């Protein structure tokens, strides 16, 4: 008769289920909640008796946890037991499978240093003999030796059905100090007899490097290079910058560089672009990755590869004929002899089932598929594709036309030093801001405007609108001049100036002239006198 436990969580899942101990083994099946058809179709998790290597009991997230180390299926964690279940489980495991249930207490000191133990299925970090935390190898997607004494662990977030409950740990770094001395195995017995030569034949190796190599072997991180379907050697990447060997497997891709290695699943590749570079020497390939690759705090949502335009590759797939006929006949070719970027594009298209985007109908003034421009302080090229803008190479920007509210053209035609260039401002929908590409040659303006209008993208030319507003304003001003300017000019000449001059003379005379109080008749008589006296009078006043 079996023993059942309800409300048990498998491998920290968000859905509980039923755990059962039977004569032939044990199993877990999720409980169907809310009539969910997806839950009802879930297959049970089964473990036979001969798969059990060891079983441990410890505190868990939802009560007490049963951790099962298997021989071939990694670590199985079952959480949600009560403290009273320990005796029943211990007796059942002993009676049915002859397996001892070991009680493990965790260290709760909170110290960030201790010792590591690489066991069959997991990495255990311990303090004073008590485990602080455990990391199953199945959760580690990649590891890198980031410095002489530091090892980085990257965790796998790409599993099928992965559904995080909230914030997730994506990377951990371990500081591993110290060195270990290794003897040179190629040394001869005569050299070993000599003490000085023996010292020379000993090599120092950091403990971090030894830990890194052992972890890679234990966790089986990355497939063996010889198992790759196809490989490309020494490919130059502009993002992340460096040269990498590309090993393409059935479901994943591994980039092996001098310092770092990256692993991505085929399903992470959202888009593939194959674009000629404007220098007519190189060809670019861009992979859009979601979620992006990570290196510390840096994320890489786009991988940019650069090839010589005429570089060719002759390669054969590393698969058996029957496997090729069964899996790859309709997707790949058995043998390739073509340009390198064409071969890689075809292979990625076949394995990821993703369309390769190439330049569309747009041609610049110089018959190229891109225009030179700058984004902030970075110079690059803007590719007007059939459905989007793309800026290369750094940073890589992709703006679909469906996200564009309007395109504003400014600085075109101004009588300044910048009159030979214009700016292209791409305004996004839903008030998501704008992106400006500056210093585009004015020769490209008309061609670019026509292309965008053909794609039903709203284009606004600020210079044309400004000129139209100015002409409208000047037109209204000229009409006002025909009505009012004549009388205004006449008033200025016949009234205002004479009155102003006359009043000024009177004021000066009253203030400085001793004869300023003469009668009006005397003034008229003086006006009829010789005009030569008036300049001398003004000179006297001055």
From Swiss-Prot:
rRNA-binding is among the record's keywords: no
Subcellular location: Nucleus; Chromosome
Keyword rRNA-binding: no
Quaternary context: Forms a stable heterodimer with SPT16. The SPT16-POB3 dimer weakly associates with multiple molecules of NHP6 to form the FACT complex.
Matching SUPFAM superfamilies: PH domain-like (SSF50729)
Protein name: FACT complex subunit POB3
Family the entry assigns: Belongs to the SSRP1 family.
Note in the entry: In contrast to the orthologous protein in animals and plants, this protein does not contain a HMG box DNA-binding domain. This function may instead be provided by the HMG box of the associated NHP6 protein in the FACT complex of fungi.
Role description: Component of the FACT complex, a general chromatin factor that acts to reorganize nucleosomes. The FACT complex is involved in multiple processes that require DNA as a template such as mRNA elongation, DNA replication and DNA repair. During transcription elongation the FACT complex acts as a histone chaperone that both destabilizes and restores nucleosomal structure.
One MF term in the entry's GO annotations: nucleosome binding
GO CC, one annotated term: chromosome, telomeric region
Comp. bias regions, Acidic residues: 477-514, 521-530
Keywords on record: Chromosome, DNA damage, DNA repair, DNA replication, Nucleus, Transcription, Transcription regulation
Region: Disordered, residue numbers: 458-542
InterPro entries, per database record: PH-like_dom_sf (IPR011993), RTT106/SPT16-like_middle_dom (IPR013719), RTT106/SSRP1_HistChap/FACT (IPR050454), SSRP1-like_PH1 (IPR048993), SSRP1/POB3 (IPR000969), SSRP1/POB3_N (IPR035417), SSRP1_DD (IPR024954), SSRP1_sf (IPR038167)
Biological process per Gene Ontology, one example term: nucleosome organization
């Amino acid at each position: 008769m079996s023993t059942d436990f309800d409300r048990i969580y498998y491998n920290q899942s968000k859905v509980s289920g039923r755990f059962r101990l039977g004569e032939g083994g044990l199993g877990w099946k999720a409980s169907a909640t809310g009539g969910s058809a997806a839950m009802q179709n879930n297959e049970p998790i089964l473990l036979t008796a001969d798969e059990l290597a060891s079983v441990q009991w410890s505190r868990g997230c939802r009560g007490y946890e049963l951790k099962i180390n298997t021989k071939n299926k990694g670590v199985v964690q079952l959480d949600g037991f009560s403290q009273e279940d320990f005796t029943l489980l211990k007796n059942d495991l002993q009676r049915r499978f002859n397996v001892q249930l070991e009680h493990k207490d965790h260290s709760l000191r909170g110290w960030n240093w201790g010792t590591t133990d690489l066991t069959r299925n997991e990495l255990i970090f311990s303090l004073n003999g008590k485990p602080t935390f455990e990391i199953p190898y199945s959760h580690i997607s990649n590891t890198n030796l980031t410095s002489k004494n530091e090892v980085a662990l990257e965790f796998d977030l790409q599993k099928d059905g992965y559904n995080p409950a909230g914030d997730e740990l994506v990377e951990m770094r371990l500081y591993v100090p110290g060195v270990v001395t290794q003897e040179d195995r190629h040394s001869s017995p005569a050299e070993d007899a000599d003490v000085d030569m023996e010292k020379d034949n000993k090599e120092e190796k950091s403990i971090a490097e030894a830990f890194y190599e052992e972890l890679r072997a234990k966790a089986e991180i990355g497939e063996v290079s010889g198992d790759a379907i196809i490989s490309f050697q020494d490919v130059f990447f502009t993002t992340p910058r460096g040269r990498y060997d590309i090993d393409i497997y059935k479901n994943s891709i591994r980039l092996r560089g001098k310092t770092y290695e990256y692993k991505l699943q085929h399903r992470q590749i959202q888009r593939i672009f194959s674009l000629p570079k404007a220098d007519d020497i190189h060809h670019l390939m861009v992979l859009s990755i979601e979620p992006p690759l990570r290196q510390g705090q840096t994320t890489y949502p786009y991988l940019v590869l650069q090839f010589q335009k005429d570089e060719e590759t002759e390669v054969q797939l590393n698969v058996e004929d029957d496997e090729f006929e069964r899996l790859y006949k309709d997707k790949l070719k058995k043998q390739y002899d073509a340009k390198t970027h064409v071969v890689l594009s075809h292979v990625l298209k076949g394995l990821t089932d993703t369309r390769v985007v190439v330049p569309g109908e747009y041609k610049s003034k110089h018959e190229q598929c891109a225009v030179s421009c700058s984004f902030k302080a970075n110079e690059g090229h803007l590719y007007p594709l059939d459905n989007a803008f793309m800026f290369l190479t750094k940073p890589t920007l992709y703006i679909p036309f469906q996200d564009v509210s309007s395109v504003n053209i400014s600085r075109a035609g101004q009588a300044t030093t910048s009159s030979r260039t214009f700016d292209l401002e791409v305004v996004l929908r839903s008030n998501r801001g704008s992106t400006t590409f500056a210093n585009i040659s004015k020769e490209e303006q008309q061609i670019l405007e026509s292309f965008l209008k053909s794609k039903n993208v709203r284009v606004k030319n600020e210079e044309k609108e400004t000129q139209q507003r100015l002409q409208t304003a000047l037109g209204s001003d000229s009409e006002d001049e025909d009505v009012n300017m004549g009388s205004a000019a006449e008033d200025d000449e016949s009234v205002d100036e004479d009155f102003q001059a006359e009043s000024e003379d009177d004021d000066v005379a009253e203030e400085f002239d001793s004869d300023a109080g003469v009668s009006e008749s005397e003034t008229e008589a003086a006006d009829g006198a010789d005009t030569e006296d008036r300049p001398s009078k003004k000179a006297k006043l001055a």
